[in-house]
C-alpha cells in the first residue's frame, strides 16, 4: 500500500463542501467519504484507534502516483488497474508520465452511474463525484481497454443477511471479528432485513474473471466536471461522444450465482 493524493483536483473543495451541499443538495446515500471527517494526524494514529494495537508494517515509501508509474513501466502490458475509488492518483500518474498509458493492459473502474440515478447526488455516483476533474481526465485517456462497473450493475445485487452469514462461515476468528466490527457487520447484527451493495468487491471479481460479465454495452464515456447540480455525472454516448471521449465497456449484468459462489469459496 502506498499513500497518495489527499485532496480532489478542484481547489478548496474540501473546505467549501458544506456550501456545496447547501447549493446542490444530496442523493439517497449520505456517505461523503473523507469530506465527513477531519484530516487525521497520522496513519499510525488511525491504525491504533481502529485496531487497538501498534502497526505491524508500514506503507510503501513511494507516493502512490510514483508507485503506479514505476510498476507499470516494470511490467509493460501485464497490469490491470482496479480503479475502485476516486481517480485522483491515476489521473496524476497519466499526466506526469503519459508513456505508461499504452503499457497498461486494462483499467477496471468501480465508478459512474450511466443509465440510472446516482447515489450521493441525484445524478452522480460517489467515486466520480468525489473528484470529477480527475475522473474526466482518466476516462478520456486512451487506455487499451476500459471496463465500467457502475451502479447500473452494482445496485442489482444486494448483499443480504443470508449472504453475509454464508460469507462469515468458515472465516478465521480474527477475520470474523474484523468483519463483525465493520459498519455492515454491526447493521446485520441489529437488523436481519439490512442489506448493502458490494460495489468494490464486484469490480475486483471482474478483474479476476472478466467472463462473469453476461451483458454489457460499448459507449463513449465522459464525466461532467462543470460545477453545478450534475457535477460528477457519468455520461454515455452509444454513437458519437464529444471530442476526446473514449470507448468503454459498461457492465450491465453479471452471472450472479458464479459471483456469490466466488465470494464464499474456500
What are these regions (language model features)?
Residues 129-133, 145-266:
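Conformational coupling and interaction surfaces
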Residues 29-31, 37-40, 56, 232, ...:
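Intrinsically disordered, low-complexity, compositionally biased regions/tails
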Residues 7-14, 37-156, 161:
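Active-site histidine-anchored catalytic micro-motif
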Residues 1, 138, 204:
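A residue-level signal for conserved active-site and pocket-lining positions in enzyme catalytic cores
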Residues 1-36:
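Active-site rim/loop-helix segments in enzyme catalytic domains that contact anionic ligands
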Residues 28-32, 109-111, 134-137, 174-179:
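Short, surface-exposed, polar/charged, turn-prone segments marking secondary-structure boundaries
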Amino acid at each position: 500500500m502506498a499513500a497518495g493524493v489527499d485532496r480532489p483536483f478542484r481547489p478548496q473543495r474540501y473546505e467549501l463542501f458544506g456550501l456545496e451541499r447547501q447549493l446542490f443538495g444530496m442523493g439517497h446515500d449520505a456517505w461523503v467519504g473523507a469530506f465527513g471527517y477531519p484530516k487525521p494526524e497520522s496513519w499510525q494514529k488511525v491504525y491504533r484507534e481502529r485496531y487497538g494495537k501498534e502497526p505491524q508494517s508500514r506503507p510503501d515509501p513511494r507516493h502512490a502516483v510514483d508507485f503506479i508509474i514505476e510498476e507499470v513501466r516494470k511490467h509493460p502490458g501485464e497490469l490491470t488497474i482496479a480503479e475502485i475509488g476516486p481517480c485522483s492518483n491515476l489521473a496524476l500518474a497519466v499526466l506526469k508520465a503519459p508513456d505508461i498509458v499504452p503499457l497498461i493492459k486494462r483499467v477496471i473502474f468501480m465508478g459512474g452511474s450511466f443509465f440510472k440515478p446516482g447515489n450521493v447526488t441525484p445524478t452522480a455516483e460517489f467515486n466520480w463525484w468525489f473528484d470529477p476533474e480527475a475522473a474526466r481526465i482518466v476516462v478520456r485517456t486512451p487506455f487499451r481497454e476500459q471496463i465500467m462497473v457502475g451502479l447500473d450493475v452494482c445496485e442489482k445485487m444486494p448483499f443480504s443477511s443470508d449472504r453475509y452469514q454464508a460469507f462469515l462461515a468458515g472465516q478465521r476468528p480474527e477475520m470474523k471479528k474484523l468483519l463483525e466490527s465493520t459498519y455492515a457487520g454491526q447493521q446485520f447484527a441489529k437488523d436481519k432485513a439490512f442489506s448493502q451493495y458490494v460495489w468494490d468487491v464486484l469490480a475486483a471479481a471482474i478483474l479476476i474473471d472478466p467472463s462473469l460479465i453476461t451483458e454489457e454495452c460499448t459507449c463513449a464515456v465522459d464525466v461532467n466536471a462543470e460545477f453545478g447540480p450534475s457535477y460528477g455525472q457519468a455520461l454515455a454516448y452509444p454513437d458519437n461522444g464529444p471530442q476526446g471521449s473514449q470507448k468503454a465497456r459498461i457492465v450491465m449484468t453479471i452471472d450472479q450465482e458464479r459471483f456469490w459462489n466466488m465470494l464464499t469459496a474456500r
